Amino acid sequence: MTNETPATSQTSQTSQTAQTGGKTAARRTHPLLAQLAQWHPGLFGQTPQPLKRGIYDDLLALHAAELKAEELGQALAIHTRSTRYLSAVAQGLPRRDLQGQAVEAPAPEHIYQALLEVFRRRQQRSAEDLGPKLRRRIAQAWQASGLTRDDYAQAMHSKKNEQANAMLQAALEEAAAQMAKDEALLRAFEASAQSETDFAQMYGLHPREAARALARARQQRSRV
């Protein structure tokens, strides 16, 4: 019940919803969501948290007298498609149970699809090209996933959305190029026998910029 809807399938849904006028608002909310927020404010409140798999059954078991299965399913479907909820998933926040305890990390595929959908919605409201920001977020999601570049690219590849595939490829290429630069800088630093401050000055870098690049390279080495 908590699987996030892929951005590719939501494009047509969103366009259809936009044409239904007053029905749109009704579909974006459900009276049961207010009740869920009272019962579990840490999950359904102003700052939603990713829900554990099986939360539907947990809610029915805990609130059997108050909940109807069909209404709960409708409410959860609306909730897990909301931008606030998808933003939490896109951040890679852990999935939580009804007690608010973190129980598992979202799957890399869910994080990636949430990123695409959140940025698609933001781009519709913004004149700014959000592509560069999305590519950076995809790169960060890849690096946090623990997958190799090829495995991540294969897992996130869409059979229908070539625009998303192009964005994915560009993000991974940019990230790989930056990682290569960081690694080269770290090797040069290690061979220089200089302090980080002196090394940054020698290369014309701001000390904080050099420190961040060296830290990224060390972190990347630790993953290999």
Language model features by range: what are they?
Residues 2-73, 77, 81, 86-95, ...:
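N-terminal, leucine/charged-rich tether regions that mediate assembly and partner docking
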Residues 57, 186, 197:
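Residues within the helices of the helix-turn-helix
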Residues 59, 152, 198-201:
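Short alpha-helical "recognition helix" segments of helix-turn-helix
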Residues 65-69, 197-216:
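Short, basic interhelical loop/turn and adjoining N-cap
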Residues 71, 157-181:
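Short, Lys/Arg-enriched anionic-surface-contact patches
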Residues 98-154:
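General nucleic-acid-binding
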Residues 176-193:
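Short, amphipathic alpha-helical "recognition" segments used to contact nucleic acids or chromatin
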Residues 178, 211-224:
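Short, solvent-exposed alpha-helical "recognition" segments
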